[in-house]
Amino acid sequence: MDQGRLQEAESIYRELIAAGTNNHIVYGNLAALCGMQGRYSELIKLLRRTLEIKPNYPEAHYNLGLALKEQGDLTAAITSYNKALQLRPNYPEAHNNLGNAYKDQGDLTAAIASYNSALQLNPNDPETHNNLGVVLKKQGDPTAAITSYHQALQLQPNYPEAHYNLGIAFKEKGDLTAATASYNKALQLKPNDADTYNNLGNALKEQGELTAAIDSFNKALQLKPNFPDAQWNSALTMLLGGDYKNGWEKYEWRTKGEKEHAKPHAIPKCKQRSGKLDLRQSDPLLLVTEQGLGDTLQFMRYAIALRDKGISISLCAQPKLHPLIKASGIDPSPLTPKQANQVTEGEWMPLLSVPGQLEISPSNPVFTNPYINTKEDLTKKWVDILGEKPHPVIGINWQGNPQAEKAGLRGRSLALEAFAPIANNTHISLLSLQKGFGSEQLDTCSFKERFVSCQDQINETWDFLETAAIIGNCDLVITSDTAVAHLAGGMGKTTWLLLHKVPDWRWGLEGDTTFWYPSMRLFRQKDQGNWHEVMERVAEALQKQFGSTAMPTEPTSPPQTSAKPQPIQDILAPISLGELIDKITILQIKTQHLQGAALVNVQAELNALETTLNNLQLNLDPTHIQRLKQVNQDLWQIEDDIRDQERRNNFDETFIRLARSVYQQNDQRAAIKKEINTTYGSVFVEEKSYQQY
């Protein structure tokens, strides 16, 4: 068998079994032969016979677990791995594969525990470090995942899967340069991997390198022609770059493959329209919405365009949009997805297939007139509620659905506090159009008094039809890339859209206007993530349009010079490794307690420091970081407790104990930092001096 003479070996083992042997090694080796040839059903049968002969055989239980997992029976596989570990607790391979089974089952906590058990027994196994990183990333901790991947790569530098996974984690953290480098390294080691080319293309696209991105997607498609993810990502990149002809064609891949990037909200029983739409057809056509509310608001206009061409059109849409659809004359009786599922007559088509059918492009917009309306009585209602407007009313909206941002719209939202330069203009009043996610920022906003007096009443209004009436009473809408942008744009309302540097495909990379909405003006980031510069431009544009009087500020000492102060640049100074990790853990704790602009600032600093640490590519002991973070968490709580005692004017023994615990915790903190510096050979070290008493 060792010489590869598999058939001969199998014949010998079967002859022994036919002769009546009851030897567990014979059955086990024959099972191994079957496994090498992918004959898992036979493998499982033979392993079970092996265990009947010798129940306390850990290797057989382990191999049975591998076979059961291969066949998709995760529960049975977990049982087999656990039996192997009962017989041999110090079995790192069993712990590792038990972690894999738990991961596939979705029990990430149990998976992490299993991987850690494996690493305690065999800390030099790169595969387990890589597997742990995958689960940590799934848990939403890309920083810890990056540490695990670096540990795997220190043990095995030419480990393509670890480089690939490292790229995924870097991309999730927004470090696109590092992600690109990791994907390229993975491709040097494994040049024929379509998934890596696809992910590299996405990282390049998000950096605005569209030609290189499309080249990467094409390489993925050369390796795997019917690769839905690469086709879909290529479509988005082409559309972003203005290649509408090829982009719309590839956009049809969105409903294919396991992921189904844009699943229709209903699957009617009638025939789905495929191929080019015949504009002379007599059969009714049902358009079925897909993706988000903003997509429906943007593309439902084409129901009107098709109806104008003589096609009998009906629309299935999200129920919360039905009153708006009716009032806008798009469909007097829109269907819910549940109703659309029962339609048997005519044909149906996903809504976002229509732009490709109509060959929509900047030179052929087909439909640019305002197409969204509200009810006149609702508009009058909000005229009365808002009352006499002493200043122009600016409707603002700052955040979209966080889940959508994770899926591919990263960076489109900004904090409410970023609107502070606008709020400083006393010639305007602000009106929040924010609903749901992000609306809690109103409670801690530094310019709360700048909102209209009826803001609380507006906050309670969730109906799109009524929101349209409120927008109708605004003089201008300023919004990030959310459904509100499409609602206001579809109404023909003057709208200023705030876009991050590489936005969603529909906005392109250049220009301050868009053919989708003639009433819209685009304000683009010049530097990725820099909303402050964008909002300064918006504030200047507001001043030109409505005039400005700055908000009064507290009197200050007169300046010593008339020269305009320059902003302080990032200060770069060497520090010890322990100090760097200490600062990172403090910022991680702050992210759990802060919100609004403060959270944005802390997250930016945290990302910068974590990137610095990751670039060192150290094989850090996670316990150092965990211990230091725990001490800083304890210090945070102690400070809260001390402030609480002081607020109550309580300076008893409890206060004294808490005060003493501060320096005790700081001594422990210094000791851990010194241990880190000593362990990793930091040039700078931790020193403390104590008052003798």
Where are these regions (language model features)?
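Extended, charge-rich alpha-helical interface modules
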Residues: 564-693
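Alpha-helical solenoid repeat scaffolds of the TPR/TPR-like class and their adjacent stem/linker regions
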Residues: 1-563, 651
